[in-house]
């Protein structure tokens, strides 16, 4: 697999990492002790990561959210859960690999996991359709949510998609109906639902897994009704320039900090220094702890109260005073 491209603002980090690796390799080849030389470089690297990642612009966070080096649903399954059993098919047409789902255990408790899944190379991206589900993916998700409800098992969803697949076949097979059906059914599911935005949350394709009692979001994830490129192209007829994309990202308020302030999401999960891609295992631990805590709180609520509070939560969105 080819190395993932480095983002422009990350280049100073990549250059310093390369310098450190070369020094380590030289020390190993010649049996040299370079501890004194390494220490200041590693400190400089840590300081540089903090400096860069504490000052990301909204557009830079969009770029981070889309990185192929970020943990995907499959990575969180590997690091945060145990005993995963994948389930397939919508029982109506076909399997959709853009949605990964199945039974798992979280700290010993059975849960139903459902998440968008992307690819890291061409072969995987074609298999996963670049993380953009067909209607069959959303119908598979709903089938498994209803199965979880039958056995009174909590549902955990992971959101990471540019949007639902807009192809002709998907539209002919009822893409909009599949998304709308999920919104309706999730609003009245009788078990706890926690949605976590782990990367890019794009439009209705994200919302189809996002009607939940708690909506969590990683620090460098984004969530919006349209891509920044699409917004810039519609409003300013320029979806390619850095300036217009930055303007759109700021106007859309796509970041976790913006969305928790707007009460669209409930909690921000902090990422390791340098982003989630810098340490998959540490990011998964943070996710596991946050999910466990929220699930414990939701478990105390009776189903009717759970559903009522969930519906009220979403009905409150968009209210304002003049």
Swiss-Prot record:
Keywords: ATP-binding, Cytoplasm, Fatty acid biosynthesis, Fatty acid metabolism, Lipid biosynthesis, Lipid metabolism, Nucleotide-binding, Transferase. Its EC number is 2.1.3.15. It is an enzyme of class 2 (transferase). One of its GO terms (cellular component) is acetyl-CoA carboxylase complex. One of its GO terms (molecular function) is ATP binding. PROSITE patterns: COA_CT_CTER. It comes from Gemmatimonas aurantiaca (strain DSM 14586 / JCM 11422 / NBRC 100505 / T-27). Acetyl-CoA carboxylase is a heterohexamer composed of biotin carboxyl carrier protein (AccB), biotin carboxylase (AccC) and two subunits each of ACCase subunit alpha (AccA) and ACCase subunit beta (AccD). GO terms for biological process: fatty acid biosynthetic process; malonyl-CoA biosynthetic process. Residues 40-297 form the CoA carboxyltransferase C-terminal domain. It catalyses: N(6)-carboxybiotinyl-L-lysyl-[protein] + acetyl-CoA = N(6)-biotinyl-L-lysyl-[protein] + malonyl-CoA. Belongs to the AccA family. Component of the acetyl coenzyme A carboxylase (ACC) complex. First, biotin carboxylase catalyzes the carboxylation of biotin on its carrier protein (BCCP) and then the CO(2) group is transferred by the carboxyltransferase to acetyl-CoA to form malonyl-CoA. Gene3D superfamilies: 2-enoyl-CoA Hydratase, Chain A, domain 1. The gene is accA. Pathway: Lipid metabolism; malonyl-CoA biosynthesis; malonyl-CoA from acetyl-CoA: step 1/1. It is found in: Cytoplasm. InterPro entries: Acetyl_CoA_COase_a_su (IPR001095), ClpP/crotonase-like_dom_sf (IPR029045), COA_CT_C (IPR011763). This is Acetyl-coenzyme A carboxylase carboxyl transferase subunit alpha. HAMAP family: AcetylCoA_CT_alpha (MF_00823).
